[in-house]
Amino acid sequence: MQAGVIAVQGDVAEHAAAVENAAAAHGEPAEVVEVRDAGIVPDCDVLLMPGGESTTISRLIRREGIDEEIREHVASGKPVLATCAGLIVCSRDAKDDRVDALGLVNVSVDRNAFGRQKDSFEAKIPMTGLDEPFHAVFIRAPLIDDVGEGVEVLATVDGRPVAVRDGPVVATAFHPELTDDSRIHDLAFFPEQEVVA
């Protein structure tokens, strides 16, 4: 399995380790490639859109021509995991003119709605598709404030969606790569198999 991490900005190394662990659990080797330029995404089986700064990520993927390749990847049914800023970039509406949302996940989001850096928090959250709660790390997390047709809510915190699936895209408001638990990557890239802790 070739996994591309959109590496224009954000948590690259952590996602690489998590996808390697998820693939290994299924007896499948993973080659992780960093995507900084156009021409790499078409060769990838799965994509990771990491956290970071959504305005920067949006601008750089558009400038490099990666945005259209990501859209084509999803249109072909190939999996994507988008986390935190990745969720914002992949949303239908980022409610920020500086973010050119890709429209891959039929949700609207409010950037940093869970608060500033000092308001970061961690929570054990039950999640559809996982046998045990997931330890989620929220850092300047976005809020999914509108869920459109065709979107499955996978997890909530205080009644607010924090993880969703829209076709081949799993998107989270939190950072699963900042834990030693690769089950979210597993859920995104091996959806047909049971995910156990």
Swiss-Prot record:
GO biological process: glutamine catabolic process; pyridoxal phosphate biosynthetic process; pyridoxine metabolic process
GO cellular component: cytosol; glutaminase complex
Example of a GO MF term: glutaminase activity
UniProt pathway annotation: Cofactor biosynthesis; pyridoxal 5'-phosphate biosynthesis
Cystine bridges: none
Pfam families: SNO
Its biological purpose: Catalyzes the hydrolysis of glutamine to glutamate and ammonia as part of the biosynthesis of pyridoxal 5'-phosphate. The resulting ammonia molecule is channeled to the active site of PdxS.
Family designation: Belongs to the glutaminase PdxT/SNO family.
Name of the featured protein: Pyridoxal 5'-phosphate synthase subunit PdxT
Organism: Halorubrum lacusprofundi (strain ATCC 49239 / DSM 5036 / JCM 8891 / ACAM 34)
